[in-house]
């Protein structure tokens, strides 16, 4: 069972934490833990901790024991936090869209020997990955998702 450390417990983040907690230990960090649903607060596989995602030292300390990190923060916060996660040597899935060029972090990821899956949000993120895969296998002329 993996130890998944998740930063961000908004509407989508809470849903992801519940899904992940079905087979893993989830450590969920957010600044607004009072706003988190009772379903999260009472889940036996989710540990809820107050973490200020804008405080890099708190983020670094929070993810220290993580097997993998899920970043689920608003896009304007994501780039700086993603850089910190990479520099801590943690594999990460980022479900946020970031206005910055994520490829600027590629060298950091290589140097820290980590895998970064970025822009992997529910939609359009995951459908883009699905489309990309199928487009390598066959010619796609139309693609719709709902």
Could you say what each language-model-derived stretch is?
Residues 4-8:
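Conserved N-terminal Rossmann-fold NAD(P)-binding element of oxidoreductases
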Residues 13-14:
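N-terminal Rossmann-fold NAD(P) dinucleotide-binding loop
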Residues 32-35, 99:
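Helix N-cap at the beta1-alpha1 junction of Rossmann-like dinucleotide-binding domains, i.e.
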Residues 43-55:
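Rossmann-fold cofactor-recognition segment
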Residues 52-65:
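Conserved Rossmann-fold cofactor-binding substructure of NAD(P)-dependent oxidoreductases
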Residues 61-63, 76-95:
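Rossmann-fold NAD(P) dinucleotide-binding segment
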Residues 95-118:
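Rossmann-fold NAD(P)-binding glycine/threonine-rich loop
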Residues 132-146:
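Conserved anion/nucleotide-ligand pocket segment
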